[in-house]
Amino acid sequence: MVAGRSRARSPGSWLFPGLWLLAVGGPGSLLQAQEQPSCKKAFDLYFVLDKSGSVANNWIEIYNFVHQLTERFVSPEMRLSFIVFSSQATIILPLTGDRYKIGKGLEDLKAVKPVGETYIHEGLKLANEQIQNAGGLKASSIIIALTDGKLDGLVPSYAENEAKKSRSLGASVYCVGVLDFEQAQLERIADSKDQVFPVKGGFQALKGIINSILAQSCTEILELSPSSVCVGEKFQVVLTGRAVTSISHDGSVLCTFTANSTYTKSEKPVSIQPSSILCPAPVLNKDGETLEVSISYNDGKSAVSRSLTITATECTNGIAAIVAILVLLLLLGAALMWWFWPLCCKVVIKDPPPPPSAPMEEEEEDPLPNKKWPTVDASYYGGRGVGGIKRMEVRWGDKGSTEEGARLEKAKNAVVMVPEEEIPIPSRPPRPRPTHQAPQTKWYTPIKGRLDALWALIMKQYDRVSLMRPQEGDEGRCINFSRVPHQ
């Protein structure tokens, strides 16, 4: 019996496996799983495990390998199945997405007692039966078959036939060989030699190939470009993701386009790179038309990714924008020509400006009063005695008398009288202190100052050009340049 995908899960169904994982792996197991690479794609993953007598002493290593690899596939839509084979094959865990059942299946897998032969084809047969009953192409199917030792007799041939049937059902087959296996046998069972993972270091080295299996098997398409196209335009799409080349080994990759959920067309890719696929796309003829893009392999039997959507939009013609830009440039050129052409074509002749008038010199008033000069009785000058000369007093320094008195000869008995009192010099009153307060500096004051300086510079240059322009009534002539031969 095959269990289907669970649609509703109670909170308890998630709690038990979480506590079980914590108990098995320790407190750091959940944190370590978060730090390691994981796969978020939805898979139907089938583990086909060898439980023959040759692995009896190493079964716990096989169990740990399955347990750790299961933790890396973190999609809530992932479904798992555990199948063991020896002389016969047994389904330990039917295909299910119920996390509670998966936890219970891991416990049952741990309790398996290995014994018997290595009939790997029996395990592949049970996987194919579940794939047929799993619900078509809703999810990709992956088979990971693990065995040790050489396959004897007709077992390799039977296993190859079952693997071909798996691929016809849309599944990918990966093989893990431990110790004394034969590489060529597993390469014929797997999809390609790149999908065979040898573990020659023994069962303890199984955990070392988990990342390699994850990188090969987790094929995801994460991004589509372009997301919108112009109506009626031919284009190609680029789908980027990881592990893209792992599905292109047989050239069966197809790009499927579905227009408006009605018309479907498949195209082979133009090129396949390690992280991208380039596909030709059909033309969209209506505004708002949608195109769903998906990738599949095995001739469309195995879906790689969910559909990504492209939308058609009306695109304006770029010629109109170019014409508008050219018109604006022409208008700007005409305006510049109107402004600068008079400067190039006229020499303005103007009268020189009159010389500036000499500034009027103002006599400085002496705020200090004139000093009193001594008076001299000049009656003794010149006559050398009394008689014939009237008495005359000369005030030195008054109305030119200083120079006149300097020519006189002072008599022997001339009397010089000096006034005792002098007029005091008045002191200037102190200047009053300014009453206005300094303006407060705002946060934008430095910015405003720089902008004002820039604007002043622009206006200064504008005024310089404006002054050079001829005004009404100015006369001149065009400047003509001609080459004069050297004499």
Curated annotation (Swiss-Prot):
Q: Which residues carry this modification: Phosphothreonine?
A: 147
**Location in the cell:** Membrane
Tell me the residue ranges located in the Cytoplasmic compartment per UniProt. 340-487
Q: Which organism is it from?
A: Mus musculus (Mouse)
> Has keyword Metal-binding?
yes
As for family, the record states: Belongs to the ATR family.
What this protein is reported to do is described as: Necessary for cellular interactions with laminin and the extracellular matrix.
> What quaternary structure, including any partners, is listed in this protein's UniProt entry?
Binds laminin, and possibly also collagen type IV.
Superkingdom classification of source: Eukaryota
The protein's name: Anthrax toxin receptor 2
Q: Which SUPFAM superfamilies match?
A: vWA-like (SSF53300)
Question: What span is annotated as the signal peptide, if there is one?
Answer: 1-31
Which residue ranges traverse the bilayer? 319-339
Q: Which CDD domains match?
A: vWA_ATR
Biological process terms in GO annotation: collagen fibril organization; single fertilization; uterus development
Q: Which residues are glycosylated?
A: 260
Pfam families attached here? Ant_C (PF05586), Anth_Ig (PF05587), VWA (PF00092)
Cross-referenced PROSITE patterns: VWFA (PS50234)
